[in-house]
Amino acid sequence: MKITNQELTKFSTIRTKSFAKYYCEPESISDLEEALAFNSTKNLSIVILGNGSNILFSKSFYENILFIRLTGDFNFFKINHDLVSIGASYSLKLAGRELIRIGCSDYIFFNLIPACIGGAVTQNAGTGIGEEIKDVCVSISCFDILKGKIVNLMNEECLFEYRNSIIKKKPNRYIVLSANFSIVNKVKDIKALVDKTKARISEKINREPSGYSFGSTFMNSSTPAWECIKSIRFRLNPSCGAFFSEKHNNWIINKNASGENIIALIKDTQKLVKEELNIDLINEVRII
């Protein structure tokens, strides 16, 4: 397994240009252990890359981080009775399609989120009440960097919260390898379930803006983030190469901005919302 320099631009859906000194794609546990052994000699931070739909590279070059993108053995989908085991690099949307095809009504929301399983678990991704990873995940398998071995965490041990988990809280401790999900709730009318899923997908596409974006910038609180941003957007700098979409005020669209430009836009927005509304906007996007 090679550890190389790598342009990171394609690994973030907002497409800010960035490069890494250290990057690797482990295809097996032994590859991952090799990467972690290398990391221990360099004392680098670790960042796991997935589909890139919730990440912002804030710098043009990284030399103190080992970027890891799991492939190979970590890309699988296996059904075993009332559980489905899915690898960390497997597409959440693809998993959703597979589960809908066999009548699993709890997994419509998988089809709406552009993430991989590992990233979705880390973020406790979801679309609303009753439609979060925590509601369907039974357990996860992860590599415990501190202990140097694979460990299994049950749902309650994952400490799932709104857009949070123990994995996110301890980024240099755990690496998600796979997750087990319950498939006990099945319906007989597959066509009706497929039609309902297609309708949800179409609705989501119609309400989301086009262009390079990482999706939601801030978490929602008692006042939706988009509503906060809408009230102060006229005071934001329109010439930085990125802007909040009028179609969805919590989405930043990138035209030609750098990571630094977008960070400045995020900070300015937080400052203005605090001044105007006395609300602290908390980042949902993962900033590296």
Give, region by region, the residue ranges found by the protein language model.
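Phosphate/pyrophosphate- and phosphate-bearing ligand-binding catalytic cores of soluble enzymes
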Residues: I3, T9-K10, N51, I55, ...
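A generic structural signal for short beta-strands and their flanking turns/coil linkers
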Residues: A20, N64, V138, R173-L177, ...
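A short, compositionally biased
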Residues: L70-F74, I133-S139
